[in-house]
Amino acid sequence: FDHPAEVQTLLAPFTTHRFFIYGITELSSPVDKGHLHLRPYSRSGFLRDLEDCNGVICGAGFELAGEALQLGKKLLVKPLRGQFEQLSNALALEKLQLARVMQRLDRKAVQLWLELPPNVPAGYPDTAQLITVWIENDHWQDIGSLSQEAWAQTGRVPRWDGR
C-alpha cells in the first residue's frame, strides 16, 4: 500500500474536495488537516463515510471496488505493484468503463477523475436465480444469453472494443 504521507501529498492541492483517508495504523483517533481527514481503522466510520462520499480512490482489489460500484460511487483505482489480480481487475474495470485507473500516484489522474460526473448505483442481479432458470429452460449451451441477461439487469451493459 502507498504510504499515507504520499497519499496526503497527492491530495493536498485539491482543497475544494474533502478526502477521508482510512487505515492509518499510526493513528489512535481521527485527525483533520483542513480538507484531509485521516482515520484509523474503523469499520462503522468507514461505512458511514463510504455511504456519504461521491467517489472512492483505492487499490484495485475486488471488495472495496465492488462496494463502491454497487453504491454508485465513481471509482479511481491504483493496482498494487506485483499483484496480478489487481492488474487484471483494473483492466476489466477500465474496459467496462466502470473506473479510471492510475498506475502510480498521479495528480493529473486525480484531477481528471474529480471532474467526472457521479456514477449510478450498479444493480447486481440475482445470479443464482438467473442460472436456475437458464438450466431449467435447457439453455446451458448458450452461455451468451445468460451473460447478456445478467449484464442487462445491472443497467451497465459492457462495451467491448474487440481487443
Regions found by a protein language model. Give the residues of each.
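A general structural signal for well-ordered secondary-structure junctions
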Residues: 17, 56, 99, 119-120
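Donor-nucleotide binding loops and adjacent catalytic segments primarily
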Residues: 1-55
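C-terminal amphipathic helix plus adjacent low-complexity
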Residues: 111-163
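A donor-sugar binding/catalytic signature common to diverse glycosyltransferases
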Residues: 46-88
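A general structural signal for short secondary-structure boundary/capping elements
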Residues: 66-67, 84-88, 102-107, 122-127, ...
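Nucleotide-sugar donor-binding patch of glycosyltransferase catalytic domains
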Residues: 40-41, 74-116
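A short acidic, amphipathic alpha-helical/loop segment
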Residues: 6-13, 67, 71, 113
